[in-house]
């Protein structure tokens, strides 16, 4: 609401703050003021009864565009203020025009000076006359010395009709250095204009190159010619790269084959073929039994010698079910004894001891028996068999203490497991150890 009130107040006071039409030309303001004067004249005539003039009215109502009235022409009813304003405007425009003309003249003078300076610089670079003009401020003795140096330095220095000029460096009004330079004509380049100019290929032609080589030593010429014309380095590089590639391939192939051999050895080492015959013949070798009691063996006493094995009839082949049951019991007791004595390792395998490339191999945990020592079998029963007798089997009485020595090299007698289910006949001179069934 407060903003609306402020806006209304500004609208009321706006005509007082409006700026007069000072930016418009004087003749346009005079034409704008003419209708107001005409209206006031008509009102006065109506009141007095006289007829106003129609000249200005007709000129305004026709709406024709013509030339602007001149500043000298005065309206029919001019005022002193309009005449003074018109004079001031004319003075201002004249002053502005003069300023513009002066600035343009200054810019043209500066441009001409720059152009002259550029021409002088070019003349100093490429013109002998300009060089002489530049040295005109020097002493005559110095000028003569420069001319002598120029003749001495520029003689046979530039080729192919090139323009030669010297750059003289003064120190304490004395000539300290003279540097000749050549301005080459079209088609030549170089410090002495001795090379053909080839666009986008900045290399000397073969003839000039050979001429330049003549100034070198013999060894340098040979090296430059060999490096520019021979392809031996490129072929040598290709051969070296080929040898390196073949070496890398052979090394990788050997490494892969070695890894496969290690894996095969590890698999065979972890699961040897002899491990599957451990129950029948441990380690696949014959086991000699030093102390084997006879079938009619009784509990020995100290100082007595056990009798030999009797082959009397009365023993028979064990039945299939009894053999299988005895085999399972013997297997459990046999492995428990070996594991308790530290011969067979535990089933758990430490992953830290296994190589990394073996962890991904499927593992078969089969423990092979490699035992050389004494095994103490307590409560081991024996049974002798004979093919001719079909009576009930006679069980050997269990000895108080039986020691079996397992050796690797001897192969006197055969230790046969009661796992035979095919009904093979046993030897009458041997007794098979049996685990007592409870």
UniProtKB/Swiss-Prot annotation:
PROSITE patterns: EGF_1, EGF_2, EGF_3. Residues 254-438 are cytoplasmic. Residues 36-62, 411-428 have a biased composition (Polar residues). Glycans are attached at residue 161. Residues 69-85 have a biased composition (Low complexity). Residues 1-13 form the signal peptide. Residues 35-94, 410-438 are annotated as: Disordered. Residues 150-194 form the EGF-like domain. InterPro entries: EGF-like_dom. GO terms for molecular function: growth factor activity; receptor ligand activity. Disulfide bonds join 154-164, 158-182, 184-193. Keywords: Disulfide bond, EGF-like domain, Glycoprotein, Growth factor, Membrane, Signal, Transmembrane, Transmembrane helix. Residues 14-230 are extracellular. GO terms for biological process: egg-laying behavior; epidermal growth factor receptor signaling pathway; inductive cell-cell signaling; male genitalia development; nematode larval development; ovulation; positive regulation of ovulation; positive regulation of vulval development. This is Protein lin-3. The gene is lin-3.
